[in-house]
UniProtKB/Swiss-Prot annotation:
Species the sequence originates in: Caenorhabditis elegans
Signal peptide positions on this chain: none
Gene Ontology molecular function: transmembrane signaling receptor activity
PANTHER family xref list: SERPENTINE RECEPTOR CLASS BETA-1-RELATED-RELATED, SERPENTINE RECEPTOR CLASS BETA-15-RELATED
Keyword hit for Nucleotide-binding: no
Membrane topology note: Multi-pass membrane protein
Gene Ontology BP annotations: sensory perception of chemical stimulus
Family, similarity comment: Belongs to the nematode receptor-like protein srb family.
InterPro entries listed in its UniProt record: 7TM_GPCR_serpentine_rcpt_Srb (IPR002184)
Subcellular location: Membrane
Residues spanning the membrane: 24-44, 57-77, 109-129, 142-162, 186-206, 237-257, 276-296
Keyword Transmembrane: yes
The protein's name: Serpentine receptor class beta-15
Length: 336
């Protein structure tokens, strides 16, 4: 009974701690705000891009996974805000085991799923660079296959991590990992972070190679195809970079607070509240990724339009303009 009372007392202190309580409202606001740019980009912007269907499919799946992550977090934060309003006893603040298992598992699935897609996008970009001359004519198969592999692999990993977990520690949040589960999940996140870091390096190499191949191409048709690969790869590189920075910040921050937090925050209650608040701030990643995608798409589209305008514009005045006019008339007569 003493242990149960201590758990309930700790739950009460953490639930009503101003740092943690305030973070839930911020978390809810950020989660809802992140949904808007994600929906806007996936529905209104991504379909209009000149990206190959495989890349569009992968980006759609990636941003949809981030969108589902935001929705899940919005539901979770709303629930955690409302629970104290209807709790009459400190122990009522603890989430029942069966609900905690479902909520915590979905958080892990959506959080980890988005970390697989940048690697798949790099695989698709590598194949696109190698097959630049014929890739535009290939059917949309690679994107769905890679997406299916991502989902299956993520589900299998989460299943093996969670299969022996009983969820009997008690928790006030769906986001907190149980003591026996936390080391496994953080190891998984570290592995994914380093894989994404390597992936970003390779993606940057692909971009440089694509630019080099475009410059060395003499054929106008081939140059245009290479240009499309360069633009889409640029977009992919910036999205992957954003993903690596934000995900890395989250993982490193969690580990610092977990193992060295007591050095900076000596009070146990304040440290626990700060760790809880930082854990919920992963929703900021969703907002930034969606907003950056919209901005980058607009920027690349604008620069591409300027490049095309500069390429096709011919001088229409003076001696050069007269020569251009004469050449145009000559070409028309030759085509008759």
């Amino acid at each position: 009974m003493t242990e149960i009372s201590e758990i309930c007392e700790t739950a009460f202190k953490l639930t009503y701690h101003p740092i943690y309580r305030g973070s839930l409202f911020i978390h809810l606001f950020v989660s809802i705000s992140s949904i808007i740019p994600l929906i806007y980009f996936v529905i209104f912007k991504l379909p209009k891009t000149s990206f190959h269907g495989n890349l569009k499919f992968l980006f759609s799946a990636y941003f949809v996974s981030v969108f589902l992550f935001s929705v899940d977090f919005a539901i979770i934060s709303t629930t955690e805000i409302l629970i104290p309003l209807f709790s009459k006893h400190p122990c009522n603040l603890l989430i029942p085991d069966q609900y905690l298992k479902i909520g915590n598992t979905t958080v892990s699935i959506f959080m980890s799923l988005s970390t697989f897609f940048p690697i798949s996008i790099t695989i698709e970009r590598f194949i696109a660079m190698k097959m630049a001359r014929t890739y535009e004519k290939t059917r949309v198969r690679l994107g769905p296959i890679l997406t299916g592999c991502n989902i299956l692999l993520d589900l299998l990993i989460v299943f093996f991590i969670y299969r022996d977990e009983k969820f009997d520690d008690g928790s006030i949040s769906f986001v907190f990992f149980p003591k026996t589960l936390a080391p496994k999940m953080f190891t998984f996140f570290w592995v994914m972070f380093f894989l994404n870091l390597i992936n970003f390096t390779f993606n940057s190499y692909l971009l440089r190679q694509s630019i080099r191949l475009k410059v060395s191409t003499s054929s106008l048709a081939t140059k245009y195809q290479r240009e499309e690969v360069v633009h889409s790869t640029k977009f992919a590189v910036f999205v992957v970079f954003c993903h690596v920075i934000l995900f890395g910040f989250y993982v490193i921050g969690i580990m610092i607070l977990r193992y060295f937090g007591s050095i900076f925050i000596p009070d146990p209650a304040d440290l626990m509240a700060t760790r809880g608040a930082f854990t919920t701030m992963i929703s900021l990643y969703n907002l930034v990724v969606g907003s950056v995608a919209v901005y980058l798409n607009h920027l690349i589209k604008t620069r591409k339009s300027e490049e095309i305008t500069g390429t096709v514009r011919i001088q229409a005045t003076g001696a050069v303009g007269a020569q251009n006019y004469e050449n145009a008339i000559f070409n028309i007569w030759n085509s008759v």
